[in-house]
Amino acid sequence: MAILKWKLSRCYSSNEVSSPEIIRQHLANHPAATHTKAVALGTEETQTTIQRPRSEPDTGNPCHTTKLLHRDSVDSAPILTAFNSSHKGRINCNSNTTPIVHLKGDANTLKCLRYRFKKHCTLYTAVSSTWHWTGHNVKHKSAIVTLTYDSEWQRDQFLSQVKIPKTITVSTGFMSI
């Protein structure tokens, strides 16, 4: 803030105008305010903020429906579903979802299991590396591997043909891609 005051005082040389007044004048003349903050090793990071007027619809998102363009909150807007979908889960607006399986368990067990999946490569589309959730409220530090499929049929074939150890938890679902 002190740097902004100093820069603005150089632009507005009047001694009779207070610092808050200088800032208000500057922001009135420059709708895109630039904020500068100091970061490590004497470098600077600059961020420009431009606010769009509330009455202007957001056209950058292809998922808007006519209901959302009328400025309803997202929570009150209807959930979009695909009419030709074979699953009953929630689908995003372009129906670009894929069936998935999360395998949860010991990290080393999942890593070895991932390599055993290579001989069943026709039964899944992709398999992730071993990952885990982080955060303050995470109670279980179990590792996770995610598998994606082209269809629910392919996922069912995978689950019926591939032996999963009893120590691994299997969760099925859908993921937007």
Curated annotation (Swiss-Prot):
CC terms in the record's Gene Ontology section: host cell nucleus
Pfam families with a match to the protein in the record: PPV_E2_C
Compartments (UniProt record): Host nucleus
Keyword Lyase belongs to the record: no
InterPro entries: E2/EBNA1_C_sf, Nucleotide-bd_a/b_plait_sf, Papillomavirus_E2_C
Purpose: Plays a role in limiting the replication of viral DNA in keratinocytes. Recruits the host NCoR/SMRT complex to viral replication foci to mediate repression of both viral replication and transcription.
Record's subunit section: Interacts with host NCoR/SMRT components GPS2, HDAC3, NCOR1, NCOR1, TBL1X and TBLR1.
Protein name from the UniProt record: Protein E8^E2C
Protein species of origin: Human papillomavirus type 16
